[in-house]
Amino acid sequence: MKQTRSPLYPIFLFVIINLIIFTLSRLGLAIWQADRVSAVAGWGQLFLQGLRMDIVALCYLFGVPALFTVLFHNSRIWKMILRIWLTLGSVFILFMELATPAFIETYDFRPNRLFIEYLIYPKEVFSMLMEGHLTAVIFSLIFTVVAFFCYWKLSGYAVRNLRPMSWKWRPVVALLVIAVAFLGARSSFQHRGVNPAMVAFSSDGLVNSLVLNSGYSVLYAAQQFKDEGASSEAYGKMDTDEMLRIVKASRGR
């Protein structure tokens, strides 16, 4: 069979699929919360900024594999790694969107740092889910498992018949991929890249959270946790009794 597909075909295919999933999920959530979206006249901003944040998320997720695909698309080992990356990344995106309605119903927000914090107490969370969202949990798990096999099969189709690229062009295309992924992930020419605060446009926290996608929201929260942990190390540790003694001494007690 002729090798007619661009080496980046698998990346483009999965980017388009996940953009569709993001958009359909956001549309469904917006229709569900239509009164609140309309109350802040947020329909246009919601989908415009939402598309922006989806592109940011996909550039972070698929930027690195796009680069390596340009360089090693003829390698069987890399094709297997790429299939795993495309499949697991897409399953994560789908699972987080499926988990979103139940989370919003409980916390009035997309999955965020609370999603991570409650993972520390899996028994309590599992009990709560079984009592209040059993149907949603079963549906999400079944759909996620089915999606895994579908994505895996689709990734196998996507990496077939890729057209070889001359080595003299690979560095050039690789630089273009780096530039596009970097600019897409930052989505801003300011000193700092885009973040949730930059795309918030209303006083309604839920509507602002709908601009994001749930995978990005959770991973951004995880990064904040990491940064908080790193910053706390600068202050060292102190025994509670010693801390109280110093405070009392400073107040003359």
PLM regions and their residue ranges:
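Membrane/wall-proximal cationic-aromatic binding patches
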Residues: V211-R253
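Transmembrane and membrane-interface helices of multi-pass
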Residues: K2-D227
